[in-house]
Amino acid sequence: MVSDNPAATAEDRDASPTTWELFRRFADDPPPVPPAPGDPPRSVEERLAYHSRFVTVRTPAVVKTLLEVRTLMALGRYQQATARPSLIVTGPPTTGKTTTLLEVGRTCHLAEAVRAGRGASQVPVAYLLVPPGATAKALALEFARYLGIPVSARMTQAQIAASVCHTYNSIGVRLVMIDEIHRLNPRTSTGAEAADFLKDLTERISATFVYAGIDVTATALFTGTAGAQLAGRAGLINCDPLPATARTSTTRAGNSATGDGRSSSDDHGRSGGGEGSAGGESNTRRGRNGSSADGADSRRSGGGNGSGTVLIRPFRETVAAMENALDLQRHRPGSLVRLAPYLHQRTAGRIGSLSRLLRRAAITAILDQSEKITRPALDAIALDHLAEEHYRPRVPARRTQRANTPARRST
């Protein structure tokens, strides 16, 4: 029933991991690793492939979501009779929601593999996409497709649901991740039926459900009876654009926000791959620009007893993490960190836009043999429409007027 074909193609690696076979390959595939000092130089093709995939930076949303999911999974492991508490990751487009979901799924998959043993036949994690205009039966078919559950044309929705619930419980699925949840519209009859069907599955499948979608609280998903039930059972994590600066309080000298002097990203294991988290060695390695690769860049103010306010720069920290992971031969360390205000203007603090900008700039630098990322090179790259609408360089009117006024001839 569950396919176990080890042969992976490039097309498979590029596809969304919405079947168990594809998700297992995604989770087991080692994440990209930044070059280490003393390593032999990589070839052009190797470096192009590396920057295409690139490291994943552990943003605050990734760290918080992982902790929440692990807590909910422990809370609901032995719960019976009622639906387990769930979680919704929401935010604007290109803020790393899907990457956050996949990184959490990868981490939970690897943790369960260690706990149960590599030879175990369990399927701990399921990842599904809500199809556009989803009906209840379409959702049921997506659940069946993930595990390769046989479905015939004559089967009713109730029969498919019964087969799905039995298989998911018997094979040990503990975490169900549903992406693009904003596509459900309970205000329509089909959308309401799909929302009710999803609620029914949360009560029949012994797993923790985590959803991700665009600005979910502003959609119809939280309205009506079904929406109220979902909102009453699901916690919310906002995956917002990264601010240029933020303040957090501290009560003890030498302590960070985690309370023990470590960056919050040090509390979790390795991760990698994608546009949202700095996994692997890049999360703890200290860069040559003076900031650690997980972005431990903060300024403290307050009294002599250690209490006060810590000024943190989450966006600058993320830029530092990505810059420290570059594999370019002539790039000047710290140059992108100094451009952090400009990069924040270009991307509006959206992690997806930032990742695409730096990955494209790195690949261009390899192809044109400049081997470095500069401000002019970044200016030459057109980003997604959202980012370009946000960033409109303003030329001072006086300078523009001078440029358009012909020079006077001397007599």
Located regions from the model:
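Conserved lysine of the Walker
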Residues: 97
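C-terminal alpha-helical "lid" subdomain
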Residues: 2-36, 40, 249-411
